[in-house]
Amino acid sequence: YHFFSTRPAMSQADYFLKKSRLRKGDLPPMLDVELSDRRIAAMGGRDVLFREMLVWLKEVGRRSGTTPIIYVSQDFVNRYMPFAPEELKKYSVWVARYGEYKPYVHLLYWQLSPDGRVRGIRGDVDIDVFNGSEEQFNRYLRTQTVK
């Protein structure tokens, strides 16, 4: 899981891979993009953001042997993804959207609540669901996890 910043994407990818201990069967690496409009503008705008995201996604994918996932908010999907290059739209997305299900992207996971409760864990936890059946999830685990 990598929280994307405005630093050069290749150095972020190098850092992520150096610090990660990816093991066989792990879920694919995740690129969490939660930059403010101001920070996106400061880095050169949405086209620069998209280019940098692709650098990270391709490099981490190449070196990890699996296709990373993009984690974004529904607001990001609405405001930025319509302008994303087709190459970026091919990546699966984990959307944080609380309330109504309305992704408009190739949704893989949906974070539907930031304040769920789970027995054995103190405090709030995110509640997430896979967008598919149990059979589809098992197939995903067999084919898309780290090798």
Regions found by a protein language model. Give the residues of each.
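Aromatic-lined carbohydrate-recognition surfaces of secreted/lumenal glycan-active proteins
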Residues: 64-79
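Short amphipathic alpha-helical surface micro-motifs
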Residues: 11-14, 74-78, 89-94
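Structural recognition of the beta-strand scaffold that forms the well-ordered cores
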Residues: 1-2, 27-33, 68-71, 92-95, ...
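Substrate-binding cleft of extracellular glycoside hydrolase catalytic domains
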Residues: 1-63
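Functionally critical loop-and-helix segments that line ligand-binding/catalytic clefts
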Residues: 84-147
